[in-house]
Regions:
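C-terminal motif of bacterial Sec signal peptides marking the signal peptidase cleavage site
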Residues: 7-10
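Bacterial signal peptide processing site
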Residues: 12-14
Length: 450
């Protein structure tokens, strides 16, 4: 009779007269379980007693609880245990009695402790529509931001009203844009992250030159995939009086092919380029110390790139750029073209002066190719060139030029009025803004937003 005794003590010694005992025979003893009615007052039961008896009350549909002896977390556990039961309770939050029918809750002026408790209970007030927090300064530590963020994640339908200042600027939790550019921050953006985690409508955050490093900015960005989070990166060599390069992470064009001013690009000083995920046009040519282009795999919108005259060999990052149509990859250490085979939009490809390249068969199925420049020094078997020409008869394949950009790669004719540009190269010059150089280079002093 031990189980029967536990259930009787846990769920009320007085069984309703209408309840009939259900006998469950056991080989050695008889156990009687009272399953109760559809509605029960369990306000005198402790959380442990409730956890014990609720699974046995199979007819229960509604139960009254005592919030004075129950935490919001424990209520959540009971709801998970019996999601089919409606739990009734009353809890005092900031001096106001709240229950499952409460629709509005005003926490204006409440202490941080009270707010933390209220946020926990608000998740279990199903009809709560509006939560008022008043106004204040985001930095005064009055709002428990982590708990509020948790509530907003659990109750995205809940309208939370709070007007606040952040670094001297005015916002609300419903703000869609936040411009904090050039405001020095000494906490690696921790306060901004805490606040913006509570702003579900945020779509634009500008933190250009705020002193927050790339890794912490990336954490803020990753927490808001629906928003455009922008900051400034630096790459290249700033030693020996060089300017280096600097761009905002939302740029669509980067021209950094002048190591004499920007410094030589290396794997170490180009890591930050991976945060420029909106780049369409990229020219990093003439950087002989650049032995990796791994950052390119984070540029899915890339359409044109010049990565010539580098010391890199792994072309696989370009496989993550499905929109790529123009690529100058001459004078590198490329030895395997297989990753390029999936680039169905690539039409103009320059592979001249690639002495480690001996196999172009991965290009056989790239029937969209219009121009392939191998030049006279890329050691590709003649039979492969012939086979590629047979498969793609409309492709211009050059195996004779001794200069990667000669032939008709850049110019199709010389006239009394100047050189006639090849259409693809003319497009490249336009999107890269070569005519505006040096003003089009990615030097910080060329950026009006710096």
């Amino acid at each position: 009779m031990l189980l029967a005794a536990a259930l009787l003590s846990g769920c009320g010694a007085a069984t309703p007269a209408s309840a009939q005992p259900v006998e469950t025979p056991e080989p050695s003893e008889e156990i009687v379980i009272y399953r109760g009615e559809a509605e029960m007052d369990l306000s005198d039961k402790s959380p442990d007693e409730l956890r014990q008896c609720l699974p046995e009350l199979s007819n229960l549909k509604e139960a009254k609880l005592n919030a004075d002896t129950l935490s919001a977390e424990e209520l959540g556990e009971l709801q998970a245990l019996r999601p089919d039961v409606r739990f009734l309770f009353q809890v005092t939050l900031n001096g106001k009695t709240c229950d499952p029918e409460t629709e509005k809750l005003d926490l204006t002026g409440a202490s941080r402790k009270t707010m933390r408790e209220a946020f926990a209970w608000a998740a279990y007030l199903p009809k709560l529509k509006s939560l008022e927090l008043g106004e204040g300064d985001a930095a005064d530590n009055s709002i428990p931001w982590a708990e509020l963020a948790k509530l907003r994640a659990e109750r995205p339908d809940l309208r939370v009203k709070y007007e606040f200042t952040l670094y001297g600027q005015e916002f609300s939790l419903d703000s869609e844009e936040m411009n904090l550019t050039h405001i020095p921050m000494d906490d690696q953006g921790a306060l901004v992250k805490a606040v913006t985690d509570c702003m579900p409508k945020l779509r634009y955050l500008d933190m250009d030159s705020c002193g927050v490093d790339d890794e912490h900015m990336a954490e803020i960005r990753d927490a808001h995939p629906e928003a455009n989070v922008v900051w400034r990166i630096w790459f290249g060599d700033t030693l020996e009086g060089r300017a280096g390069y600097s761009v905002r992470t939302d740029v669509d064009r980067i021209l950094a092919s002048n190591p004499g001013i920007g410094g030589e690009l290396t794997p170490e000083n180009t890591k930050s380029l991976k945060y420029c995920t909106k780049v369409k046009y990229l020219d990093l040519g003439h950087n002989s110390y650049m032995s990796s282009i791994d950052f390119v795999r984070y540029m899915p919108d890339l359409e044109a790139t010049v990565l010539a005259m580098g010391n890199w060999s792994d072309v696989s990052p370009l496989a993550s750029c499905p929109k790529l149509r123009y690529a100058e990859l001459q004078t590198t250490c490329i030895n395997d073209l297989r990753p390029l085979a999936r680039l169905k939009n690539l039409t103009d490809l320059n592979l001249c002066y690639n002495f480690a390249l001996h196999d172009i068969s991965p290009l056989y199925e790239m029937t969209q190719l219009k121009r392939l420049y191998l030049g006279m020094y890329t050691p590709v078997p003649a039979e492969q060139v012939a086979e590629l020409q047979r498969r793609i008869p409309g492709c211009e394949i050059n195996t004779t030029t001794d200069n990667p950009t000669d032939g008709q790669w850049r110019y199709t004719a010389v006239t009394p009025y100047g050189n006639e540009l090849a259409p693809a190269y003319e497009w490249l010059r336009e999107v890269m803004r070569y005519e505006e150089a040096p003003g089009s280079y990615a030097y910080s002093y060329n950026d009006p937003l710096y």
